[in-house]
Amino acid sequence: TASVYGAFLKTLKKSATKPIVLEPAFFEYSKNQHVVFNEDSNQLIQEVEGDILYLDPPYNAREYGANYHILNTIALYDDFTPRGKTGLREYEKSNWCKKAKVANELETLIRNANFEWIFLSYNNEGLLGLEQIRAIFERYGIYQLKSQKYQRFKADSNRTHKQDSTIEYLHILHK
């Protein structure tokens, strides 16, 4: 896989047999206060403020909870027992991964964000189209767009894609 862990493998690839090595993270000491949150972004946005808000939400219907369940288990440091066909733990489904709800999630977040600058990273294959994002951003301030073309990452040689590249967008809002 491409550094995601969506389920237990029926047959192990060579790369899956390597030991997982966890090394301590080194953090730079600073006089500044750092805070980490683990809650719904649209609830949290009503409690925080700042100069710059950088957003990098899921682009598609693939849930982060499923793709990164091993990392979540490591972070939780609990006695999880895999169950079911995939072995995944229960996780909260995100409205950012639902086509019918994602535009409202973004609109609510932008409307309630008490930040001067908002940057949103999103690609051309996401659930939201370029014009949808532009329309939402333009309702709240001055909008700019930057883009960068990237060669598509192919997780395995058997996959076929219509496109060999993707475009990453940086949507910029000055509120």
Label the predicted regions.
Residues 130-175:
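Class I S-adenosyl-L-methionine
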Residues 72-111:
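Glycine-rich S-adenosyl-L-methionine
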Residues 1-68, 79-92:
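SAM-dependent nucleic-acid methyltransferase catalytic core
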Residues 96-149:
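Conserved Class I SAM-dependent methyltransferase catalytic core
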